[in-house]
Amino acid sequence: MKRAMPFIISGMMKLTIGIATCLLLLFCLVLLQQSSNIFNHHKSVFTKELDEDSCLSRYPSSLYRKTSPYKPSQHLISKLRRYEMLHKRCGPGTEAYKSATEKLGHNHVSNSGDECRYVLCVSPLSGLGLGNRMISMVSMFLYALLTERIMLVDQRIDTSDLFCEPFPGTSWFLPLDSPLMDQLDSFNREYSRCYGTMLKNHCINSTTIPSQLYLYLFHDYGDHDQMFFCEDKQMIIGKVPWLVAKSNQYFVPSLWLIPSFLTKLIKLFPQKDTVFHHLSRYIFHPTNQVWGMVTRSYIAYLSRTDERLGIQGSLKSMYWEHPTLTGAVVVVHQPSQEAHQQSDKKLHNKKTLAEMYLLSMTDEVVISASSTFGYVAQGMGGLKSWILYEPVNHTVPDPPCGRAISMEPCFHVPPVYGCKGKTGTNTGNIVPFVRHREDRILGIKLVQDTS
């Protein structure tokens, strides 16, 4: 009997292995079919030229979320394909890029209209959270799409550790040997080529076009910096070959208030509150290391749950100290295990990005007021979050939370200029699809116009 047992176990093991193998093969076939369906659904958003192995998150990420009800327009799809061709023609390493770089040595340029033009997205080397970086990069990319520019990004920080290259056959990183590289830290509001400063000093007009222009679009920008959002000023800015931009804002809503952009935007985004949803999913794909963090956490903690609630906040100790009223089991998972954002630490930023992605994979999400971290998660997930309002004079608001009016991020500090000489313009009352946000009277955001 003792000798028979191993054979029985062995037979059971073989049967178990056989069943497991069949299930695994079936799962792989389903996964391949789903991946095929994903590509067919997004075939115009994600080109076949992109290498799947070098960026494992690009296609399978949709498997971890519910199917998005928001479909990209054909105009957006075509625009992205044309942009990819333009980036491939004008990107780093090309003759066109070399020719454009040579212009940086000139004070002024004459623009024939057929040269490549660029917008360089620069982030401070410290002090700027990942959420702010991501919402400003989406804003810059939309601006690049609207103005036929190539968007490049600063590679001195950890962008390459966080995100895959989004465009096929080329790079979006400013080369380290670029003449601009040594100047990046000197770009500030006092810089001689700062747009606001030049405008204030009457040093820029339609006949004197500088080879480069610095755009200061941070929350504390001045009145002259804010003139960037004026139609007539865009006509001049559009002729400058190189724009270097620093921002911590999601300034997309104000682009909709520029008449020449509005006609293009309506075609690209018929559903106006899907800008961040579509563009963030297009340009942001976690590197394999970050994607590994996401998938491991998802499989271990989220894959077998009936309903997933994402909360952007520190709640773990709450459920240790206070049971639920109904006795229901609440399990809180936080990959980074860090209560405060540490924007200068590369590993922390990887964990932060992983958490953003995990939040975007939930069924419902609750975020704190003014949280760019939360904005990224809700936008990528296509979710209208519940927003926890900030206390006023140490008093909890009534109600304490409310539903977001759209899944778009908020432009916290929109311009209050008047492009036609008016001051104190209320940018939340100009068009019905740009409104004041739910919990910040000065901020504005895009909504789907139902009027």
Regions found by a protein language model. Give the residues of each.
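Leloir-type glycosyltransferase catalytic cores
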Residues: V392-S451
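Donor nucleotide-activated moiety binding/catalytic core segment of transferases
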Residues: F7, H322-T362
